[in-house]
UniProtKB/Swiss-Prot annotation:
Any GO BP annotation: regulation of postsynaptic neurotransmitter receptor internalization
Region (Interaction with PSCD3): 181-258
Region (Disordered): 1-52, 293-349
GO CC annotation terms, alphabetical: glutamatergic synapse; perinuclear region of cytoplasm; plasma membrane; postsynaptic density; postsynaptic membrane
One matching Pfam family: PDZ
Residues found modified as Omega-N-methylarginine: 270
Gene3D superfamilies found in the cross-reference section: 2.30.42.10
Full protein name: Protein TAMALIN
Superkingdom of source: Eukaryota
Biased composition (Gly residues): 338-348
Gene: TAMALIN
Organism the protein comes from: Homo sapiens
Length: 395
């Protein structure tokens, strides 16, 4: 049963309970009476709906269990009265309702049976510390328990003396000097619970700070062992992890795309691979040789001392008889250095792409600009030219 059906049912009951004026006056048709406004269901039907006050008065006749069941089935709520919004009672604004006065009586050789503790509450808004004395423990079958004292009660006064703000030792002396009868005014609130939660929060913050320091230390050790890096800023670790994942996904890290087999493809020029040095000038070097099919008359220059590749460059064999003079061979050296001169790890994708394009040694290979005419001349004199790869390795 929904709230709308309850309204209709209430209107029908009111219509049945109200007597019809035409039935009481038989001669109403001959002598029409003056229209008298009477409250009833027709007036209620003329309006869009009954007001909230009338609806509350109508719903009071129903049993609460039936009304709650109908509201639970329909999923509706009761209409709100204007000007009477529901408000939670703030217990901190009415402390007088929580105050209670207890009288404790004991024998000469007996104790009151409760323990107190003084705690300082820090108010950040007011920049002050409030000292609160509360009951931390009540013994079983003691005069304090029989009087109704409970753990958590804040002591406001002792024997009519206000003890708020008094030191702990002075409160203890006042209680001991009271004799066998003690009159306590207590206040039960949430201040003690707040103090306990605040202390636990500070403990958790301290633990979090210590664990975070251990985590940063482990991250530094991991990066030092895996990558050989020593970074003081822990924020760089996220960048390193993202770059490494991107390089692995694109297949640009060593191992995912070997650079050596790419240089040894049949039908393409051979050359050196990456230089094996662990210093800051570690980079990628590659040399391409171009020559004619005719055997050369002079042997090629010796390979450079600092270049480590998969093997020496292939040169055509010298024929047994004299032949025409062979064309001069050209060599080009390309240096692809990573940012920062890092040696062990992978280089960025742009540099590896440039190295692969240079490894293909296409016809449109751009010549390197030399700094002097002497170097350009020595390049075309076999036997006199120095290794360009060795010169580039010093940069």
């Amino acid at each position: 049963m929904t709230l709308r059906r309850l309204r209709k049912l209430q209107q029908k009951e009111e219509a049945a309970a109200t007597p019809d004026p035409a039935a009481r006056t038989p001669d109403s048709e001959v002598a029409p009476a003056a229209p008298v406004p009477t409250p009833g269901p027709p007036a209620a039907a003329a309006t869009p709906g009954p007001p909230a006050d009338e609806l509350y008065a109508a719903l009071e006749d129903y049993h609460p269990a039936e009304l709650y069941r109908a509201l639970a089935v329909s999923g509706g709520t009761l209409p709100r009265r204007k000007g009477s919004g529901f408000r939670w009672k703030n217990l901190s604004q009415s402390p007088e309702q929580q105050r209670k006065v207890l009288t404790l009586e004991k024998e000469d050789n007996q104790t009151f049976g409760f323990e107190i503790q003084t705690y300082g509450l820090h108010h950040r808004e007011e920049q002050r510390v409030e000292m609160v004395t509360f009951v931390c423990r009540v013994h079983e079958s003691s005069p304090a328990q029989l009087a109704g004292l409970t753990p958590g009660d804040t002591i406001a006064s002792v024997n009519g003396l206000n003890v708020e703000g008094i030191r702990h030792r002075e409160i203890v002396d006042i209680i001991k000097a009271s004799g066998n009868v003690l009159r306590l005014e207590t206040l039960y609130g949430t201040s003690i619970r707040k103090a306990e939660l605040e202390a636990r929060l500070q403990y958790l913050k301290q633990t979090l700070y210590e664990k975070w320091g251990e985590y940063r230390s482990l991250m530094v050790q991991e990066q030092r062992l895996v990558h050989g890096l020593v970074v003081k800023d822990p924020s760089i670790y996220d960048t390193l992890e993202s770059v490494r994942s991107c390089l692995y996904g694109a297949g640009l890290l060593p191992g995912s795309l070997p650079f050596g087999p790419l240089l040894a493809v049949p039908g393409r020029p051979r050359g050196g691979a990456r230089r094996a040095r662990g210093d800051a000038d570690d980079a990628v070097y590659h040399t391409c040789f171009f020559g004619d099919s005719e055997p050369p008359a002079l042997p090629p220059p010796p390979p450079p001392a600092r270049a480590f590749g998969p093997g020496p460059a292939e040169t055509p064999a010298v024929g047994p008889g004299p032949g025409p003079r062979a064309a001069l061979s050209r060599s080009a050296s390309v240096r692809c250095a990573g940012p920062g001169g890092g040696g062990g790890g992978g280089a960025p994708g742009a540099l590896w792409t440039e190295a692969r394009e240079q490894a293909l040694c296409g016809p449109g290979l751009r010549k390197t600009k030399y700094r002097s005419f002497r170097r350009r001349l020595l390049k075309f004199i076999p036997g006199l030219n120095r290794s360009l790869e060795e010169e580039e390795s010093q940069l």
